[in-house]
Amino acid sequence: AVGYILCAADYRGFVHCYRTTYLRRVLRTAPDQAAGLLGYLWCLGKIKNRPVHFHLDILPPYQRQGWGTRLMDTLCRHLRELGVDYLSCCGVSRDSAGYKMYRKYGFTESYDYGHNTVSLSLRL
């Protein structure tokens, strides 16, 4: 494996599961991690108008070799087939390699959280 891409095409279902299952489990088992997870939930609320959310991670030895673009191409093609109009990711640092890759791919900033962190969206 070179990395992965995860996508929640059902925003409401994802947020519901995040709140009722994942967040509750983490609060019981690792309460010190709750602040970051609650912050993430707040970030998700800022992209409700562009609700298809994803996460991409490429292992360091495979970065800058086109794998991220290939995974994005596959995901975008699949989402278009489902009739999805927008794809979003939240909590991206403007200083990150991911930010540069997403911008090159065509993503635009859709929300500024401050502290050099934004949500990015792509019209499919």
Segments predicted by a language model, with ranges:
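Glycine-rich phosphate/pyrophosphate-binding loop shared by adenosine-nucleotide-utilizing enzymes
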Residues: 1-4
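Feature marks short, surface-exposed loop/turn motifs that line or immediately flank catalytic pockets
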Residues: 9-13, 62, 95
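Conserved GNAT acetyl-CoA-binding A-motif
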Residues: 49-52, 79-91
